[in-house]
C-alpha cells in the first residue's frame, strides 16, 4: 500500500485516516514481527506455557480472567488481537514468565492457521463462535473452521478448553489431539 505525499497529508489530517495508516503499517510489519516472534516462541519452549484465547465474543474478558487466575501480568494482555499485534504480544512474554496469555482474533480467512503456527499454544480457550465475522468470512461454517485452526495445532500433551454450551464450539473436541 503506497501513498503519494498529498495522500499522506490528507490521511494524517483525520482520525480515520491516521487509523487507516496505522493499520496498514501493522499489516505490512507482520512478516518482520512474525519471524522475530517465532524465534522468541522457540526460546520460550519448556519454561513458559502459552495460552491462546480465541472466539467471536468474550475474548478480552476471558483472556484477562485467565491471566489473573494464572498469576500472569494482566497489563500485557492486549485487546488488539490481529496481525502484528499477535506477534508483539508474543514478544512481550518474558522467558521468566511461567505463562503468557494471548488474545487472538482474525480479520479474514487463513489468518488463524498462521497465528496457530506462530503461537504454538500449550492451552487454547475457545469462548464462542458467532456471526461477528460475516463481513470477512462467508458463513458460520467458515468461521467455525477458521477458529478451529488454533485447536488443531495442539499436541496430545496440550489442553483445549471449549465452551460446551455453544454447539458451534463444542464440535471442536473432535478437531484436536489434546
Segment roles from a protein language model:
Residues 4-164, 168-177:
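Phosphate-binding loop of NTP-binding sites
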Amino acid at each position: 500500500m503506497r501513498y503519494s505525499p498529498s495522500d499522506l497529508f490528507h490521511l494524517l489530517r483525520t482520525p480515520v485516516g491516521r487509523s487507516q495508516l496505522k493499520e496498514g503499517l501493522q499489516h505490512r510489519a507482520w512478516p518482520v514481527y512474525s519471524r522475530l516472534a517465532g524465534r522468541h516462541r522457540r526460546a520460550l519452549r519448556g519454561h513458559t506455557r502459552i495460552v491462546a484465547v480465541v472466539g467471536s465474543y468474550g475474548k478480552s474478558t476471558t483472556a484477562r480472567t485467565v491471566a489473573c487466575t494464572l498469576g500472569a501480568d494482566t497489563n500485557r494482555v492486549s485487546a488488539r488481537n490481529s496481525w502484528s499485534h499477535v506477534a508483539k504480544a508474543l514478544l512481550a512474554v518474558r522467558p521468566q514468565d511461567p505463562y503468557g496469555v494471548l488474545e487472538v482474533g482474525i480479520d479474514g480467512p487463513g489468518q488463524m492457521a498462521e497465528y496457530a503456527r506462530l503461537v504454538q499454544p500449550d492451552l487454547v480457550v475457545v469462548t464462542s463462535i458467532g456471526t461477528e465475522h460475516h463481513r470477512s468470512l462467508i458463513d458460520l461454517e467458515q468461521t467455525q473452521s477458521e477458529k478451529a485452526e488454533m485447536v488443531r495445532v495442539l499436541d496430545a500433551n496440550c489442553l483445549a478448553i471449549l465452551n460446551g454450551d455453544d454447539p458451534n464450539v463444542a464440535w471442536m473436541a473432535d478437531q484436536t489431539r489434546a
